[in-house]
Swiss-Prot record:
Mg(2+) binds at residues 5, 100. Its cofactor is Mg(2+). Coiled coil: none annotated. Pfam families: PIN. Toxic component of a type II toxin-antitoxin (TA) system. An RNase. The cognate antitoxin is VapB7. Residues 2-129 form the PINc domain. This is Ribonuclease VapC7. One of its GO terms (molecular function) is magnesium ion binding. Keywords: Hydrolase, Magnesium, Metal-binding, Nuclease, Toxin-antitoxin system. Belongs to the PINc/VapC protein family. It is an enzyme of class 3 (hydrolase). Gene3D superfamilies: 5'-nuclease.
Amino acid sequence: MIVLDTTVLVYAKGAEHPLRDPCRDLVAAIADERIAATTTAEVIQEFVHVRARRRDRSDAAALGRVTMPNCSRRYSPSIEATSKRGLTLFETTPGLEACDAVLAAVAASAGATALVSADPAFADLSDVVHVIPDAAGMVSLLGDR
């Protein structure tokens, strides 16, 4: 199972960008159940927030609703244990924002095979495999198409 960061969802549903097609491929693979994935309520909230800055609220909420079942049904972490681990990561990893530290803690606690994100701050973590959602990253996750 992989864990998705907001960047994957934003690029998959956003405007032209070098990461858009690889992120779309990954989201499609998740929807087709070719790869198991999870994320957090915070990631969905951030995605909806970013989307609502460029589109109307109904569009943003609809995409959030579509994304939730595909990415949230596979893992439900202990909020207390994950938050404690996330706060430790936040405290000890200067480049990591608080919300990203909690996401990394979810990935580590879930035994995820990868945390997929365009954010380079995740590369500084030793207990989470960070995969950039570019063409090479998608080959590592989905194999060569």
